[in-house]
Amino acid sequence: SFGSCSPNPRRDAPLLAVRVLGIESSCDETSASVVEGDGASATLRSLAILSQDVHAIFGGVVPEIASRAHLTAIAPVARQAIADAGIAQDAIDAVAVTNAPGLVGALLVGVAFAKGLAATLGVPLIGVHHMEGHLFATELEDAAAAPPFTALLVSGGHTLLLDVPEWGTYRMLGATRDDAAGEAFDKVAKLLGLPYPGGRHVEAMAATGNPRRHRFARPMLNAGQRPGDDDYYDLSFSGLKTGVLHAVRDAEARGTIDAERPDIARGFQDALIDTL
């Protein structure tokens, strides 16, 4: 589980600057970057990303296709990241790689490549939990984004609310009981006949929608809940998705679906964001 990640080294000990090549292949994007840091601060030296557009025709990620695409892309993407950082390959001090969670086959491609590269260079290999990577990325944007803080992690497959007293220590406050927020966006996009990945398309359509035409229930926001209840911070989006399905079917039966799509998109987006 996310809460069982191993603690990271103390941040207050002085360290020499090191360069780490990071590799990510947990889903449908192959990416690599070089990060340079001294334990107190870090700088993103490069970032190379290759998205897999092939999944659009299927309306979602096909694991086998994702794994094969990673096999083709991972070496060129890593080389590009090193070149963009303006360093030689032997200047890499460590290799970090996403090792969970994600699509098993996709993860295996990244981990196998990272293991081979680390062994070739004779440098340490560091496994990184995908969700912990999201947390640490905030410091690359804002050096002041250091614990203690409360974190809301919203990604394609996860929606988590965490208490972060220090790096490496995480307490789960709440999580989705079913669909993640990103997953709900993709599924609703499909119901509305929009391309994959659906988030940006739902957002664009919702921008022209009437917020009062379709007001969907805000899941898990019950008046009877009190702080301290086990489910106080939990989320649920499957019911919201079902509400959208019924709204689409009703509009189709009335023959007004084309006119109502933006209103349905707006109602869904408002409900999900209000819930978060």
What are these language model-derived features?
Residues 30-36, 151-153, 159-163:
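Short beta-strand scaffold segments in enzyme catalytic cores
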Residues 16-17, 128-150:
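Conserved phosphate-binding catalytic cores of ATP/NTP-utilizing and phosphoryl-transfer enzymes
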Residues 76-84, 267-276:
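Phosphate/ATP-binding catalytic cores across multiple sugar-kinase/actin-like superfamilies
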Residues 18-91, 97-101, 130, 134:
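N-terminal beta-alpha supersecondary unit
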Residues 143, 166-210, 241-251, 255:
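Glycine-rich phosphate-binding loop plus the immediately following alpha-helix
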Residues 204-275:
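A contiguous, well-structured pocket-lining segment that forms one wall/lid of small-molecule binding clefts
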Residues 97-121, 140:
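Short Gly/Thr/Asp-enriched flexible loops that form oxyanion-binding sites at enzyme active sites
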